[in-house]
C-alpha cells in the first residue's frame, strides 16, 4: 500500500475512533511510510469528531458516533485537515457494551479520495469466515447501514464483526486498509454505498 501511494505521488491521512491509533501504527510500521503518511487524528471522544474533523454536530446528536455518515465525514474531514490525497476512517463499537444504540461489533470504515467510488461494484472485505450480504437501501435512505452516501468520491463499508474487543479492533484495521488497497489497485468498490458485511474478527 505504501509503495502504491508512493508510486502515485499521493498521501494519506487517518481518522480513528474505536481503533485508537492502530491503523496509524500499522502504516508507520512499514519502511518508507514517511513518504506518504501525513498523520492521524484519534478522535475517540465524540466531540473531537465534531471539533477537529468537522463532523456535523447535529448528525452526532441525532444518530451518535457509530454511523456510516459519520464515518464518511471523518474520512473527508481528516483528508482536508491534514492536506492529504486520501483519507480513511474507522468508527464502531468494540465492546464490551453497546454504544449509541448499536450492538457490539458494529463498525463502519470509510475511504475518501479522488475517484474513490467511480465504479458500480460492491466492496466485500476478505475473510475466510466472511458472509457478504447485499447492501440494502438506496439513494436518499438514511439512518441504517446500507444507505447510499452522498459524494462520488467516498466509499463506506458497514461491518458486523464477531469476537472479543481486541479481535474487533484488529479486524477493523484490516478492513479499512483493504478498502483503501482496493481503491488504489483499481478494484471495484461500493459506489459510495455502505456495504453491509458480517464476519468473524481476528481472521
Please give the residue ranges for each predicted region.
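Short alpha-helical segments enriched in small residues
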Residues: 1-203
